[in-house]
């Protein structure tokens, strides 16, 4: 963020959890799926799906349009094969710490860079080649 990078979370997970993580990380924006609760706190059911697991690119495109970003300015980072759907035409994708063999295979097949360690600082040179982390 100090570099002026806009950070957003696009998750097909539950908004209560994603919102807490987004708040903790102080990201610029986030989107996830939610539930509807009654006045007594009982679960009524799921709300319409905002983020489709296999089509997260829809939300990436919306965030780009809302914020005036060109696809060439977007780098998505994900740990699962379904996260590859965030790679909209003209954008980049980095596979990060894939936990499943299927995810690693999908990243390799998609010919995207992959960081196999649980160290997020390792994506820096993939986003800013030749630069040190400030």
Task: Give residue ranges: language-model regions.
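C-terminal cap/substrate-recognition subdomain and adjoining C-terminal extension
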Residues: 1-134
């Amino acid at each position: 963020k100090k570099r002026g990078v806009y950070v957003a979370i696009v998750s097909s997970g539950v908004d209560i959890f994603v919102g807490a993580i987004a708040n903790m990380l102080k990201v610029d924006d986030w989107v996830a799926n939610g539930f509807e609760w009654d006045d007594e706190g009982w679960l009524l059911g799921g709300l319409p799906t905002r983020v489709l697991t296999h089509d997260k690119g829809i939300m990436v495109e919306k965030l780009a349009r809302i914020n005036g970003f060109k696809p060439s300015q977007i780098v998505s980072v994900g740990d699962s094969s379904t996260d590859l759907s965030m790679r909209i035409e003209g954008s980049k994708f980095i596979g990060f710490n894939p936990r499943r063999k299927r995810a690693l295979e999908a990243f390799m097949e998609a010919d995207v860079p992959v960081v196999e360690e649980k160290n997020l600082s390792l994506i820096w040179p993939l986003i800013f080649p030749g630069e040190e982390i400030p």
